[in-house]
């Protein structure tokens, strides 16, 4: 279908624009498919459901009956239980229709006859055990067991006290003769022996003469002040590397040889978080 001359650039809704012809098979550049460029979860992301146990079991697999084995309950577990337990005992005789029980008769002991006289008979008296009231008899005594000492009685016994000695000068109740002490001869009375028992004249330090005499003037000698210097750290002649200066001098081209890195290198994954 030919279009008018003035409307070659316009497109009608009733027709489709002409498609450009595709290049031949020789002109299409074949590039290998790199799986690392495909952004999506890998095959290990989707796991199959487990075939063991009863939680999240695979529905396509047969599942055997599962039983739970619990440990034996101890007395401590029953004691630590916070529920009130069977303290609310309901009477089994009470039903929703009321009391339901058979006739009951209480059985008690036989009551003694209150009309009988409790006076003792003549056969219940023992005359052989009674001494004649008009005759003399020897005194009778009762021997009981010895009372034990009190455990909390902490008083010392008589053998815990010692009598004072009667020998020597330390007698508080008797008169003692004079007592002398004899020392050994291995003690030499030299000039170094402290007989008086007090400090010597060399023990005390001699005071300064300025304390008890007229004090002369004193002066303090200080060090000489240094000239002000600029201590700012500055580089010396050996700090500059002249061989590396290439700003104003010609130099040969330099290349950096490194390692070829791949954009699709698998990184080291240490912590896996689902």
Swiss-Prot record:
STPGR repeat start-end pairs: 199-224, 235-260
Region of interest called Disordered, as start-end residue ranges on this chain: 1-27
**GO cellular component labels:** cytoskeleton
Q: Which UniProt keywords apply?
A: Repeat
Is Repeat found in the keyword set?
yes
Which organism's genome codes for this protein? Homo sapiens
| Protein name per its UniProtKB record | Protein CIMAP1C
| Sequence similarity | Belongs to the CIMAP family.
Q: Where is the composition biased (Basic and acidic residues)?
A: 16-27
- Which InterPro entries does the record cross-reference, listed alphabetically? CIMAP, SHIPPO-rpt
